[in-house]
Amino acid sequence: MAKVSAVNRNNHRAALVKRDKEKRTALKNIIKDRTLSVEDRFDATLKLAQMPRNGSATRVRLRCKLSGRPRANYRKFELSRIALRDLASAGQIPGMVKSSW
């Protein structure tokens, strides 16, 4: 089990990303638009720099929904390899069977 504070911190970051997504993408589009003046693009760069860092999508870590484990996660299931193995062996994941040959 991961520390509760680490999981809560990550959840808070995800909420900030969701909240600031439109504003960030608008500023990034202004920065990339070569038809605008240099001053407008620079102002957009300064505004983007003033936004909180935790609002960036790269700051959010993919964590297991059950254990909060930050590594070895399957995106499709949003579970760590350990939790996925436990649930699959218990028959909790439909269609997943242990392979044998």
Swiss-Prot record:
Pfam families: Ribosomal_S14. InterPro entries: Ribosomal_uS14, Ribosomal_uS14_bac/plastid, Ribosomal_uS14_CS. Signal peptide: none annotated. One of its GO terms (molecular function) is rRNA binding. Keywords: Ribonucleoprotein, Ribosomal protein, RNA-binding, rRNA-binding. Binds 16S rRNA, required for the assembly of 30S particles and may also be responsible for determining the conformation of the 16S rRNA at the A site. This is Small ribosomal subunit protein uS14. It comes from Gluconobacter oxydans (strain 621H). The gene is rpsN.
